[in-house]
Amino acid sequence: MEGLKTLGPCGHPHPQCPPTPASSSHGGGLDQPCQGFVGWPCLGPISSAHSVQSQRPFPVPGAGGSGPTVEGEAPGLFLSSQEQRARDTEGPRQGDLEAGLGWGWPLHPGSNQGAPRQGGSIGSGTRPCPCPPLSREGGALASPRVALSQLQCGLLGSAEQSFLQLEQENHSLKRQNQELREQLGALLGPGQQFLPLCPEHSSCTALAWPPDPAGTQPLGNRAPLQLLRRELCQGQEAFVQQSQNELQQIRLCFERKKMVITEVWDNVAEMHMALNNQATGLLNLKKDIRGVLDQMEDIQLEILRERAQCRTRARKEKQMASMSKGRPKLGSSKGLAGQLWLLTLRLLLGALLVWTAAYVYVVNPTPFEGLVPPLLSRATVWKLRALLDPFLRLKVDGFLPF
């Protein structure tokens, strides 16, 4: 079982190693030194053969190997001033290194806690193991398991840095993709759809996470990164290579889509400029048409004015001509003949009236019985009676209506 979590020399909490009984094979020799603190939790359960070590830290300097120790005692808790200063200087340096890398816990398997430091990191791009070095009291040499754990620590450190870089690039790409989607949505409108994702890259969406608006959650506590760590434990380099290839494909797809969007944007800008030019041309044409219509109205008004003036002038000329021609005809023979014809017509009309009256009075008044009463009023009839009373006969009196 794991012990209580204490603050290790690297500045991070680690569960302590469980205690083991004192060794009696060497005749009261020293206990085995502590193999460090249990590290990376994503590697799953740690075997008892690798993780169960002595709980005691380092032995007190000067104690040597004389005399056995009792279980429950902790003589290694009292350290000399030199070892304490060395450990204090070593701890902040490792803590600063881990803080620079951005990880919340030491990333090395629990079975490899006792790898000693040999002059810094193993290679370029790898981070050193944050656990304290092993004590080689009594001339004990490091086992092959320690060397293997040191190599795995270096590989895991480089892989973690690669995954951290991949995740940061993925996050930046998704942020750029979100911005491009917003721009494309504003460009296309509410009824349009976005371009679908490439079918070979649709499996990469499982590694994405929603953008954190606050941005306070560290990268090490995110679920996709823990999933990548578990997959890293199973297949390290192959998975890293596959991720790099997929990232390269995503970049290429992103560049292609970006070029297509840029072309579409250029075409839209050209269409917008063309529409603006057409609108300007239509406005100018409208102004020209209005000017032409105004000119046509002015021309029509001038034509009507000229026609009216011509008609008035012609009428005046005709009147003047008729007046100048009619004056010398008054004293001519044509005027005398006209007067004679007028006198003749008057005589004929008088004779017709006299003949009609004689016919009605003497011969037959029947045709005029229905015509004369409506034409003559009562007063006219009485006047006619008074005028014709000396000449009236019975027949004529019956003809009159009153």
Curated annotation (Swiss-Prot):
The chain crosses the membrane at residues 347-363. GO terms for cellular component: membrane. It comes from Homo sapiens. Residues 154-189 form a coiled coil. It is found in: Membrane. Keywords: Coiled coil, Membrane, Transmembrane, Transmembrane helix. It is a single-pass membrane protein. This is Coiled-coil domain-containing protein 188. Its main location: membrane. Residues 1-30, 50-74, 108-131 are annotated as: Disordered.
